[in-house]
């Protein structure tokens, strides 16, 4: 299946989606003459980003799973924060690579970029919260012993049973005692 890719001054080309997402993005990047270091993605004509750039590089799923055949997509550059700074991984903007993009398209891309950045910050906060674990001193934590008190008790849990010879011995003693009393 094929899709149409629009870029620049109303230029377009066909792309086969029966390939891995990474291969597709690499091919599109080379067609629009962008360096390998630039991150790109595709957006629909409605302005909805496909977020293909978020997939792992070794992701082997076909692009046809995420893209509709015979549809038109715009190439967008994903702008990140300045390298070497704290905001290096921040999402600054999704810029369509069109000469004169529509204002509504820019607004739709800005809204999606802001939402993605908020999600990224939220994930960072959750990771930080997991790292910070309050450890109480051992004195305040009640220690649970293995169910025994300070008195020494037998470690045996089951009731004591006598074997057969023990019963016979006791019976014999009781009989002897009772017979002696009768006499």
Swiss-Prot record:
Chain intervals for the UniProt region annotation (Disordered): 136-183
Compositional bias (Basic residues): 170-183
One Pfam family from the record: Il2rg
Example GO BP: transcription by RNA polymerase II
Molecular function as annotated in GO: RNA polymerase II cis-regulatory region sequence-specific DNA binding
Superkingdom per UniProt: Eukaryota
Classification via PANTHER family: AB2-183, PB1 DOMAIN-CONTAINING PROTEIN
Listed name of the protein: Uncharacterized protein CXorf65
């Amino acid at each position: 299946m094929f899709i149409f890719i629009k870029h620049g001054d109303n230029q377009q080309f066909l792309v086969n989606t029966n390939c891995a997402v990474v291969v597709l993005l690499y091919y599109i990047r080379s067609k629009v003459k962008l360096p390998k270091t630039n991150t790109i993605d595709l957006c629909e004509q409605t302005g909805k980003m496909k977020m293909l750039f978020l997939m792992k590089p070794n992701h082997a799923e076909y692009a046809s799973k995420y893209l509709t055949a015979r549809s038109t997509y715009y190439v967008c550059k994903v702008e990140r924060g300045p390298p070497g700074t704290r905001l290096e991984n921040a999402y600054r903007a999704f810029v369509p690579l069109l000469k004169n993009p529509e204002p509504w398209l820019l607004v739709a891309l800005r809204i999606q970029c802001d939402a993605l950045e908020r999600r990224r910050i939220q994930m960072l906060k959750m990771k930080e919260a997991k790292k910070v674990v309050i450890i109480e001193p051992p004195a305040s934590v009640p220690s649970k012993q293995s169910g025994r008190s300070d008195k020494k008790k037998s470690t045996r849990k089951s009731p004591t049973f006598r074997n057969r010879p023990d019963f016979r011995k006791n019976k014999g003693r009781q009989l002897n005692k009772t017979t002696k009393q009768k006499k």
